[in-house]
Amino acid sequence: MKKPIRNRWIVSKKLRIILWVAIVLAVYMLANTSYLLLNRFADMANLDFFAAGKTSIPILFQVMILSHTGVGILLVILMLVFGILHLPKVWKLYQNKSGLSGIAYVIIGLTLGITGLFILTSAASRENNWAWWLHVICAILAPAGYIVHRISSRGNKPSKVSYKKFGTAIAGLLVVFIVWHSLTNRDVIMTEEAQLAMEQGLHEGPGAKNRDVSLFIEDEFVPVGFVPTESPFFPSAATTTTGGYLPSRIITRNDLGSQEKIKEEIDQYGFVKETAIGATTCNRCHQDIVAQWETSAHRFASFNNPFYEATITDMRDHATEPNMWVQKHVAQYKDFGEDGIGRAKSKWCSGCHDPALMLAGKMNKPIDRNTAEAQAGLTCLSCHAIDKIHNLTGNGNYNIADEQEDPYLFATAKDGSIGAYLHDAAIKAKPDVHKQQMLKPFFRESEYCMTCHKVSLNETFNNYRWLRGQNEYDNWHDSGVALNASRTFYLPPFKRECQFCHMPPEEAVLGDIAAKNGMVKSHRFIAVNTALPYLRKDTSTINRIVKFLQDDKLRVDVFAVSTESHPEPMMALNKGDLTLKAGEQITADVVVRNKGVGHTFPGGTNDSNEGWLEFTVKNEAGTTLAISGFIDEKGHLDKNAHAFKAVIVDKNSNPIHKRNAQDIHVVVYANVIGPGTADIAHYTFMLPEE
């Protein structure tokens, strides 16, 4: 039987063009893939001279990643076109190994394309890393499959010269990539502002990350937390890596929204409520986290918080009593003008409340509350750009890494644009640098929260002396919650950081790419602040706060009862047999136990935060016989209520009612419940004769 006669090439001229284009693209893809694998190996082996790095990512590397995607998609399309046009024809002639290997090759190519596209989607989370491994395996099988297919083709076997040319082209292109990468790979690509600051030596100055504060004090003794008056941020303890003011885009990421929309919201609500200043770009990948943050007290920390705005405005206008430190600072920075004492003192608060304003040098001048920076609150980068906590004194004692911005291509592209898509694709393909910038190991520790939730007031601020302000950190640290106090009634099974309670796992219903097992760390920062959500009519957040507080935080028990006829207190009332007689005086001991609050209850600024007991005695008909802790018709609390709060006064014994911290002189009393401890209230009342 005669063998079928056929040409060396069974493909048409048009298909041959497609094939040659595919081969050229395959050469590029193999060189590209080899380059990317070399980078990965360099990362794993810590070969810093070649690795893409942890803090910066070369432009060439990003181009290679993005072109890997683009060329890969094109190659899969060409392969499909070629297969659809080629396979039916050859299948009729040769139903042998050649045909089967061709089908297998098409399947591998399709899998390669599908997994590659999947990796680019928001579903490409850590739980779905199987897609990456399948993509890698198919990438190895694809060239091998093509070679097997060509070898199994009877008359179309490639020559040794073809192999040599193919291999030489790949190797040559790879060498070009390696040399190019080696010449352009740099550690950190700094902003223009950072380069200028470095040239001026500000990075070694009083406002810098690595400042030596001993150079700015004449005394040999340097107090912990000392802030030089020469610092541009004085009296705030905050610093920047460059040592000077930063462009506000470092904090807002230039996600400023529409100025017209901002003005409309301020006119309607009194503050910006809907525009997510500083979070629009982040929202493209972190939808759940941004949605949570939008409802948080952190977001409403600056001039978008009416309570804080009133306080800081009053301070800037009326805290004008000078002292030698503030005077020296104001004299050095001329933009304060002649009436800058109050504005200078306000920076004590601004390190934690107004970073978008203060770090950009805008607190020195009158504030336009209609600007995006004034309405930004604590943006994503207000926290995630922190790369160092200087010490444990609090007062915003952090450093903002402002020497570089988003190092990925098309970082400034607008939402919905091709540039934005390519930018996000580059991050997803190589997220290491993004993670290194945005997530430091200490973010999981209580010391991270401490920098703003531990406060002291000193003479530079209050013209008086050092005073302790709110201090959640020390209360937590010295308790059983941190496993540092054995005398605590209630010890948790393990050390609980701040984040355990205030950033619990929450289901990522919007598909946040940071989700692990479908959960993200909640960025609602739920605590007890119901005032801000009440202003916004945010009932959902109020309900979450109520649920949070009712989750075994406190336990209230009528612990003991004594009467005139039985003066010895009877405890364990559920097991006792006590009869109360009409006309008799009764004393009830009510115990409040702090079981689930990791610091004092209440926490925060206890001159304004207040809890109380409501104790009511009713008869069988439901008639109230005695009550303590009621709210009167004017909305005021019963003056005789057993309250948990602090009473603080100024030098004239006037209560501190306006959050005017600069006027605090002494604490009259502070009735709070420490973590794992208890408080007791005694209630005495007369039962009526009838």
For each predicted feature, which ranges?
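Surface-exposed extracellular loop regions of Gram-negative outer-membrane beta-barrel proteins
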Residues: G351-D354
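Primarily the internal scaffold of c-type cytochrome electron-transfer domains
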Residues: I151-A169, L183-I266, G270-K273, I289-I341, ...
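Membrane-embedded alpha-helical bundles that constitute the cytochrome b-like, heme-associated redox core
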Residues: K2-P223, E230, T239
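N-terminal-proximal low-complexity accessory segments that begin disordered
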Residues: A22-L30, L36, I262, Q268, ...
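Short, conserved interaction/coordination micro-motifs, predominantly
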Residues: R284
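Feature captures C-terminal
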Residues: A678-I680
